Curated annotation (Swiss-Prot):
Keywords: DNA-binding, Repeat, Transcription, Transcription regulation. Pfam families: HTH_18. SMART domains: HTH_ARAC (SM00342). Residues 158-256 form the HTH araC/xylS-type domain. Signal peptide: none annotated. Disulfide bonds: none annotated. The keyword Nucleus does not apply. InterPro entries: Glycoside_hydrolase_SF (IPR017853), Homeodomain-like_sf (IPR009057), HTH-like (IPR037923), HTH_AraC (IPR018060), Tscrpt_reg_AraC-type_HTH (IPR020449). GO terms for molecular function: DNA-binding transcription factor activity; sequence-specific DNA binding. PROSITE patterns: HTH_ARAC_FAMILY_2. Residues 175-196, 223-246 bind DNA. It comes from the Bacteria. This is Uncharacterized HTH-type transcriptional regulator SACOL0084.
Length: 745
């Protein structure tokens, strides 16, 4: 039976060049080796990897005590695994990162060690490692593509050679091959001899004999079987041809070589199996994934281009419900964490005027000499002032006289409280318009000239256009809501609905921009309550990972919207919702026990982008400068969130993105690679695994919060011109890569 691949350890040099009719990858186990090709010599030291491609001339020159190992793949085996073997021309370059070199060497060391050990499961383990090696080469080693459709006449001889290597075991003729390349028989024969120095039939028989030698050496099959499976019509024909090329009969050739069993062929010369295994162990590391589960590959070439576009960062507005919630030390800590990680500086609180009216109308009278009805409010204001937060307060049902009077008392007190300190940035937000707002805003502006007025904008606002025009000089922002879940019926599986829902937020934004333009209203927008597709239950909201979808929306909105709103945490959010559907109108940053939700990390990663855009497309944006830049890649797939609950219908897909950043200045660069996806940073799965009917204890809480973070990889790389990155993208995942060149020494 023809062997699919060979696994060898070599301690002796080759005396002559040989043309490889297969694909070879190996590394130096010990010492030093010189690898020669037609034009160059490459010096390889211990641990260095080498690759010799199909049809290349090569020679090994091992220095004293040098040992190399290699895996040699037969082209017929590769042709069974790949649609186009012409794509399997590999180049080890600066673009092959140290991490990927380590992983290739790791797999090969395991493979050779397994081959030498030859235990009960060696063959099965070998086959798994061989597939792993090929997958890793395909994904992480740069390749050159040669399409059969674009081969020029000068390359047609090579095309014939490749065809022979894949089909040598079949009945081949000069007539068949000339038709294959579109030449006449005489022209092909002439070109073949000119290019290779031998005729077509000589080359065909040489190829068959080389493969037959392997079978004679490594199998115990009969000579007749070997003859037939290598393209000879009979054992007699095989024997004549074999003796012509080797000056031996097949039987003599086999007899001159000792019987080499599967576990012995790698342990020749001065090294015993145990010594080789000990040497190989130095290169074996822990492997995270045994088989790469890549379903699709994508190739992206990026060259930085000057652009007039800028990326705008958002002002983040955090909803906390009642103002008194700011007295909670856990909530204070969460706000400060947000402020540190992505510059949160504005808090939105519910209307405090009804609370003040209740105190003012209490059956007993507060004595101003011994008490302060604003005591708890003052503590909240002090926290905001101490940490440079601005306060936006939602005014609700403000059309009564009692309300207006209480409002003025409150505003006057706040002005007095902050007068001896730095100014408080104070804003008012209304969702409905009433003429009493004019009196209130005049009083407010007299005490807080830098204060802002936020007006909720929707179709109903048009009915109050005259009042809106009167208030326009005081308006700082228009506020709106947009929830993609409102656009679909989750009981249906209509893809068109989900496609429409994916555009719902940006479509509503554009509608409001157009409405403002029609009525000559020019103010920045704030998207306060919003959500992407999540389904209409708490479970789908957690299971449906959508980091990439959120990033997609943020990028689309960055040039149209100035502010983005979030609820601070789950408990505050859910306590102000009527039902699950109402809960889906907004997004919170924290879950319980200070667990950070993926949207928190999405905001954090987005904040790492800078304003200068170097490159952008539908799934990638690069910002910064050519020596200090940020690459953001994301996947955004909109589908019914209920499918995320169906284990039988796995909506998780994996794509390998081969990314090249070209024309970089030569030097040493630092790479920081953040990965946020369902396997790295998703809180919900870990939460459910560690949650019991009695909740979670401290150990579980600490563990879940510690593990629910994006993955971070940091390394240095020496770049001469091109930065090559291999990125494993899971459905709706996000990758942020920060690249910074070190100063020249």
């Amino acid at each position: 039976m023809q062997r699919d691949y060979l696994i060898r350890v070599e301690t002796e040099s080759m005396s002559d060049f040989k043309r490889l009719n297969s694909l070879m990858i190996g590394f130096v186990i010990k010492g030093e080796a010189h690898i020669y090709d037609e034009n160059n010599m490459t010096q390889c030291n211990s641990g260095d990897i080498f690759i010799i491609n199909h049809r290349d001339l090569y020679r090994f020159q091992l220095q004293q005590d040098g040992i190399i190992c290699y895996i040699q793949f037969q082209m017929k085996y590769l042709a069974d695994k790949f649609d186009d073997v012409h794509c399997l021309y590999f180049h080890l370059t600066d673009a092959t990162t140290t991490k990927n070199i380590h992983q290739l060497r790791n797999i090969m060391a395991r493979l050779v060690s397994t081959h030498i050990r030859h235990n009960e499961l060696s063959k099965l383990t070998e086959q798994q490692l061989v597939i792993q090696l090929l997958m890793h080469m395909i994904h992480y080693v740069p390749r050159t593509y040669h399409s059969n459709q674009s081969i020029l006449n000068d390359d047609k001889v090579n095309q014939v050679c490749d065809y022979i290597e894949l089909h040598f075991h079949e009945d081949l003729s000069l007539s068949e091959l000339s038709e294959y390349v579109g030449w006449s028989e005489s022209h092909l024969s002439k070109k073949f001899t000119e290019s290779l120095g031998v005729g077509f039939h000589h080359f065909l028989n040489t190829t068959r004999i080389e493969h037959a030698k392997l079978d004679l050496t490594y199998t115990d099959e009969t000579i007749t079987d070997i003859a037939l499976q290598n393209g000879f019509s009979s054992a007699a024909s095989f024997a004549r041809t074999f003796k012509h090329f080797t000056h031996q009969t097949p039987k003599q050739y086999r007899g001159d070589r000792p019987a080499i069993t599967e576990n012995q062929q790698s342990a020749q010369h001065d090294y015993h199996d145990r010594e080789l295994i000990l040497l190989l162990n130095d290169y074996i590391e822990e492997m995270n994934h045994f088989i790469e589960d890549i379903e699709k590959m994508n190739y992206k070439e990026i060259a930085f281009q000057p652009t007039n576009h800028q990326l705008n960062q958002f002002n983040h507005i955090i909803q906390v419900g009642y103002l008194r919630n700011l007295l909670n030390t856990q909530y204070q800590s969460q706000l400060l964490t947000c402020h540190h990680d992505f510059q949160v500086n504005e808090v939105l609180a519910y209307d405090v005027i009804p609370y003040i009216m209740k105190k003012l109308n209490a059956p007993f009278t507060y004595d101003a000499e011994i008490s302060n009805i604003f005591y708890d409010i003052d503590l909240c204001l002090d926290f905001l002032l101490d940490h440079n937060f601005s306060l936006t307060m939602h005014l609700d049902q403000y059309d009564s006289r009692d309300y207006i009077d209480a409002f003025k008392i409150f505003i006057h007190h706040v002005a007095l409280h902050v007068s001896h300190r730095k100014d408080l940035k104070f804003n008012l937000y209304v969702t409905t318009l009433h003429t009493s707002l004019i009196e209130m805003i005049d009083y407010f502006k007299a005490l807080f000239p830098n204060g802002g007025l936020y007006i909720h904008l929707d179709q109903a606002t048009e009915r109050h256009l005259p009042l809106l025009k009167r208030l326009e000089p005081h308006i700082d922002h228009f506020v709106f809501d947009a929830n993609s879940n409102d656009a679909v019926d989750f009981n249906k599986m209509n893809d068109d609905e989900f496609k429409t829902a994916s555009q719902m937020i940006i479509n509503k934004t554009n509608y409001l921009i157009d409405l403002m333009h029609r009525h000559r209203l020019k103010r920045p927008l704030i998207l306060l309550n919003w959500n992407t597709l999540t389904g209409d239950t708490f479970i789908t909201n957690g299971e449906y990972f959508r980091g990439g979808i959120i990033i997609e929306q943020l990028l689309k909105l960055s040039s149209k919207v100035e502010g983005i709103g979030y609820w601070l945490n789950y408990d505050l959010h859910v306590s102000h919702c009527k039902n699950e559907r109402d809960y889906m109108n907004s997004i919170e940053l924290f879950h319980q026990y200070n667990g950070k939700r993926p949207v928190y990390f999405t905001a954090l990663l987005f904040n790492k982008l800078t304003s200068n855009i170097l490159y952008s497309d539908d799934t990638c944006i690069v910002t910064g400068t050519d020596s200090n830049f940020q690459i953001l890649l994301y996947d955004a797939k909109h589908f019914n969130p209920y499918l995320a609950l169906d284990n039988q219908m796995n909506m998780r897909a994996t794509e390998m993105i081969h990314l090249n950043i070209n024309a970089l200045e030569e030097g040493m660069y630092k790479i920081k690679h953040f990965t946020l996806d369902k396997e790295n940073g998703a809180l919900f799965n870990l939460w459910r695994k560690h949650h019991t009917i009695h909740g979670m204890d401290k150990d579980s809480i600490d563990y879940v919060n510690r593990m629910s973070f994006p993955k971070l990889e940091v390394y240095d790389i020496d770049i001469t011109d091109t930065l090559a990155l291999n990125i494993k993208m899971i459905t709706n995942g996000i990758h942020l890569i920060e690249v910074k060149r070190y100063p020249s020494s």
